[in-house]
Amino acid sequence: MGTSTTESVVACEFCGERTAVLFCRADTAKLCLPCDQHVHSANLLSRKHVRSQICDNCSKEPVSVRCFTDNLVLCQECDWDVHGSCSSSATHERSAVEGFSGCPSVLELAAVWGIDLKGKKKEDDEDELTKNFGMGLDSWGSGSNIVQELIVPYDVSCKKQSFSFGRSKQVVFEQLELLKRGFVEGEGEIMVPEGINGGGSISQPSPTTSFTSLLMSQSLCGNGMQWNATNHSTGQNTQIWDFNLGQSRNPDEPSPVETKGSTFTFNNVTHLKNDTRTTNMNAFKESYQQEDSVHSTSTKGQETSKSNNIPAAIHSHKSSNDSCGLHCTEHIAITSNRATRLVAVTNADLEQMAQNRDNAMQRYKEKKKTRRYDKTIRYETRKARAETRLRVKGRFVKATDP
């Protein structure tokens, strides 16, 4: 052959580990066989993607022609450069190559590419492929009859030779073996490297935990969260909370109301919350009343001390609880005073806005009464020129018209 082909290895764009042997036209991605099965078996839409082999010369484009003389698969441009440049290479036996879609099995791919995985004859694989693959071997081996007649005359021997995969046949054989082992060991799942995040970068594989250990850990956690759980191994009894008594007790002590099995009602919790809320409200009311009385008494004491010039230090000996209630009530009183002031300011603003709106409406009505509807001429020069221009049927006559 006149030109020398450069054999370059292209890594798979999905896993980044194995050599890419297929080119997906829809995704414009180069994939190895396991990743191709993994990607295009995701849904029905991805199964429609047409894939074909990668050119042996440029390793960038999908193949369109197979050269039997040089045992190469070439894209359209490389085929034109190789076989269209000289007359000697134009006589090489070539055939068109078509892509495939779907998710063919390992045996079907091996039969298409002429690779013997199970030791069977290629004719048996060819018959199996014709029945199951969804497209005949003629589209793979010889391509379209019209294209084949335009290239070179072909015979039966050309069909038998059309199974050659090119220079990457050994790589395809290894990936088919890997794919076959993945189907057998994984029960139909494709063996794809773990940690792939889509961009070709591989992350560290996360440690896996067996399903049995997860069940055991869940059962242990469930036993540890039971209400009557007792640690017999250490000899220490755990305290449990009794919602009926409102306090904690030992698991061995009998409860007034025994719970039956796993049926557990939260009525006691609701009652407990309601009782707590009622107690808090009562305590708040009492503290508010006490503070009100203290405030009135302190006010009177201050007035008396002012009149008698005696410092008002009457209630300085109050307990800490009373002082806490006093601070709480003062905070509430201050908040209520601020809210009252805010409401008063808002009402004043609304009244001012209403008054301003009434004044504006009155001014508008006064202007409307004195409004004059006289016909005024805004552009006097245009008016004068329009009166002197010639009209025909009410329309102006252009200066260029005769």
From Swiss-Prot:
What is one Pfam family matched by this protein? CCT
Query: Which parts of this protein are zinc fingers (B box-type)?
Result: 12-54, 55-97
- The UniProt annotation places Zn(2+) 1 binding at C12, C15, C35, H40
Which organism does this sequence originate in?
Arabidopsis thaliana
> Which residues are in the CCT domain?
357-399
Keywords, ordered alphabetically: Coiled coil, Metal-binding, Nucleus, Repeat, Zinc, Zinc-finger
**Residues that bind Zn(2+) 2:** C55, C58, C78, H83
Q: Where is this region: Disordered?
A: 287-322
GO biological process entries = regulation of DNA-templated transcription
Compartment list: Nucleus
**One of the record's GO molecular function terms:** DNA-binding transcription factor activity
The entry's cellular-component GO terms read: nucleus
For bias type Polar residues, the affected ranges are 295-310
Tell me the PROSITE patterns matching this sequence.
CCT (PS51017), ZF_BBOX (PS50119)
Coiled-coil regions listed: 345-372
The Swiss-Prot or TrEMBL record describes its family as follows: Belongs to the CONSTANS family.
Q: Which gene encodes it?
A: COL14
Predominantly, its location class is: nucleus
Q: What is this protein called?
A: Zinc finger protein CONSTANS-LIKE 14
